[in-house]
Amino acid sequence: MSGLSYDKCVTAGHEAWPPTVVNATQSKVFTGGIAVLVAGDPITEHTEIKKPYETHGGVTQPRTSKVYVTGKKAVQMADPISCGDTVAQASSKVFIK
């Protein structure tokens, strides 16, 4: 069971790319007064900390098949991001089983 993730949740970072945040695109469902994340929500682009200092973005790719928010899959802690990163933060009060 993982927590439901919300706007500005941090990611874990991957390889030489540091952690960044995920940006909510929907504004109808909230946890703790903060918009929850759904499939396709973008990360703030992040830049490698070593040469060639490439910058890339990515979008959330939720694993749940049971929980939907505004018609899209809900994002939870440990869900992958298309660039290889992972969602690393979530609500401590709302969980997806």
Curated annotation (Swiss-Prot):
ATP-binding among keywords: no
GO molecular function term, any single one: metal ion binding
UniProt keyword NAD, yes or no: no
Pfam hit, one: PAAR_motif
CDD domains noted in UniProt: PAAR_1 (cd14737)
Binding residues for Fe cation: H14, H46, H56, C83
Keywords (A to Z) from UniProt: Iron, Metal-binding, Virion
InterPro entries attached to this UniProt entry: PAAR_motif (IPR008727)
GO cellular component, one term: virus tail, baseplate
Transmembrane parts of this sequence: none
Compartments, as annotated in UniProt: Virion
Cofactor dependence: Fe cation
Function: Baseplate central spike complex-associated protein. Makes the tip of the central spike which probably punctures the host outer membrane, a necessary step for viral DNA ejection into the host cell.
Subunit structure: Heteromultimer with gp27 trimer and gp5 trimer; this interaction forms the tail lysozyme complex that creates an extension of the tail tube. Part of the baseplate macromolecular complex which consists of gp5, gp5.4, gp27 (central spike complex); gp6, gp25, gp53 (inner baseplate); gp7, gp8 (intermediate baseplate); gp9, gp10, gp11, gp12 (peripheral); gp48 and gp54 (proximal region of the tail tube).
Name this protein carries in UniProt: Baseplate puncturing device gp5.4
